[in-house]
């Protein structure tokens, strides 16, 4: 599409919005920008790209949407916004950053450039990072972008300006980005899993699933579908005329299946009946990370990358901050930071990765989720649960039949202190909130920092007490 002299309204001034402003401005569009926040981030940066008189802060007004050719919408702005819906009904196109990226890639990328696309409720960032490391280990130049690291358009502009094109683009994509994407043609794409999330944006989980399914182009495209065969909603996304590879923690029977094979006392990552590497050789903990590794392997094999460097990369992959990250161990108790667990599915996966008794710290803003899936793993894996935040009571009600002690606290410091008192030698204290953080913290990273500081405080007191006793 030729954007020269087109009047385009960009909604949202976050990282993605700024990337769209930069891309559209260099394409010659007449750009205006709006954000519902009165003092949005990046305002000073934005004023260096477009004239101040084209920047509007505060509630959206109807006049902003008049006489425009298109709306470029940030993931944080809902398409259900009434003024956006009114514009759609008048024939105004609504696009997002990934749609702009896909169109541009068709125009600029050299032949043979590969694309792997990743979405899901949980594990997206881990799998995208894994795939990037695995593909780099084969000698390829790889760009990992999208809902991770650089915005896709920022990464694209850097590559255009340097003239150095990657062999492979690895794109982590959110459901919000996929809502406005129709031109992306990945060589292979995966939906890792689906659990209740973002139900503050979607009326029902089926709407959320439909947005995720947009990662797969029409059935006549050559995209390989990588599907979680143990998630019914994901498996139902299979196109009759497309090639599929599946992954899961069950034993694989055929060459198009990746899974876990038991052998004696060991568990192996496998393709079909071929054992690839022991699960215990992964540097990341938990069976959910074994599933992540299998999804990453399936994606890489879909574009014929060789096994040996892929497996070596998996062997040394250390994981990501705030995702089942071990932060301390003292008095026989291990503390794990899984603050990135912002939905129920993620917390369930974290708990199911433990064999030892766990003291679970959970709670926050549940975003309308159903917490009942926590009941079984809480019953099976926890010695106690410590709850805080806005939806602590809802979680407490959901797990009341578990016959596990539940403690309500007001602060993270108190949560850590109570957890340490509940824990016995050999136990783990796990922060896996199953909720968003904004009711009490700036973001999930801030929540993790407060947790880590509290753990360090307890550890310091424990060491001082031990020294005094000696």
Swiss-Prot record:
> Where does the UniProt entry say this protein principally localizes?
cytoplasm
**Pfam families reported for this sequence:** Mur_ligase_C, Mur_ligase_M, MurD-like_N
Q: List ligand-binding residues for ATP.
A: 120-126
Sorted alphabetically, the Gene Ontology cellular component annotations on this record are:
cytoplasm
Instruction: Give the residues annotated as coiled coil.
Output: none
Any GO MF annotation of the entry: ATP binding
Q: What class of enzyme is it?
A: ligase
Keywords, A to Z? ATP-binding, Cell cycle, Cell division, Cell shape, Cell wall biogenesis/degradation, Cytoplasm, Ligase, Nucleotide-binding, Peptidoglycan synthesis
SUPFAM superfamilies in the cross-refs? MurCD N-terminal domain, MurD-like peptide ligases, catalytic domain, MurD-like peptide ligases, peptide-binding domain
Job of this protein: Cell wall formation. Catalyzes the addition of glutamate to the nucleotide precursor UDP-N-acetylmuramoyl-L-alanine (UMA).
UniProt name for this protein: UDP-N-acetylmuramoylalanine--D-glutamate ligase
Gene from which the chain derives: murD
């Amino acid at each position: 599409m030729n954007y020269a002299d087109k009047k385009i309204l960009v909604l949202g001034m976050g990282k993605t919005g700024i990337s769209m402003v930069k891309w559209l401005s260099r394409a010659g569009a007449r750009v205006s920008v709006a954000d519902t926040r009165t003092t949005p981030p990046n305002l000073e940066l934005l004023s260096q790209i477009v004239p101040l008189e084209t920047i509007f802060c505060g509630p959206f007004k109807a006049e902003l949407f008049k006489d425009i050719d298109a709306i470029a919408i940030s993931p944080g702005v809902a398409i259900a916004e009434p003024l956006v819906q009114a514009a759609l009904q008048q024939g105004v196109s609504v696009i997002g950053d990934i749609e702009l990226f896909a169109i541009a890639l068709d125009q600029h990328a050299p032949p043979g450039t590969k694309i792997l696309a990743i979405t899901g409720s949980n594990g997206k960032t881990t799998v995208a990072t894994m795939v990037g490391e695995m593909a780099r280990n084969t000698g390829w130049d790889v760009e990992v972008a999208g809902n991770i690291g650089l915005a896709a358009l920022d990464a694209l502009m850097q590559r255009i300006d340097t003239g150095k094109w990657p062999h492979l683009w690895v794109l982590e994509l959110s459901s919000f980005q996929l809502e406005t994407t129709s031109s992306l043609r990945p060589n292979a794409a995966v939906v890792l899993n689906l659990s209740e999330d973002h139900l503050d944006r979607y009326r029902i989980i089926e709407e959320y699933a439909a947005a995720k399914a947009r990662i797969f182009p029409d059935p006549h495209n050559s995209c390989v579908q990588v599907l979680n065969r143990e998630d019914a909603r994901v498996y139902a996304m299979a196109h009759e005329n497309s090639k599929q590879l599946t992954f899961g923690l069950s034993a694989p029977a055929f060459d198009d299946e990746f899974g876990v094979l038991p052998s004696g006392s060991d568990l192996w990552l496998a393709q079909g009946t071929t054992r690839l590497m022991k699960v215990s050789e992964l540097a990341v903990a938990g069976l959910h990370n074994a599933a992540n590794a299998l999804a990453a392997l399936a994606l890489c094999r879909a574009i014929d990358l060789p096994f040996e460097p892929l497996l070596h990369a998996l062997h040394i992959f250390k994981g990501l901050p705030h995702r089942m990250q071990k932060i301390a161990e003292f008095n026989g108790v291990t503390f794990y930071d899984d603050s990135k667990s912002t939905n129920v599915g993620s917390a369930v996966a974290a708990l199911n990765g433990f064999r030892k008794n766990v003291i679970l710290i959970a709670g926050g803003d549940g975003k309308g989720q159903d917490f009942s899936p926590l009941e079984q793993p809480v019953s099976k894996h926890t010695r106690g649960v410590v709850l805080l935040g806005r939806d602590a009571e809802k979680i407490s009600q959901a797990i009341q039949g578990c016959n596990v002690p539940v403690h309500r606290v007001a602060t993270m410091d108190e949560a850590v202190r109570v957890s340490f008192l509940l824990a016995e030698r050999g136990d783990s204290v796990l922060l896996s909130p199953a909720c968003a953080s904004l009711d009490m913290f700036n973001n999930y990273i801030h929540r993790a920092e407060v947790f880590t500081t509290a753990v360090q405080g307890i550890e310091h007191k424990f060491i001082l007490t031990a020294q005094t006793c000696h």
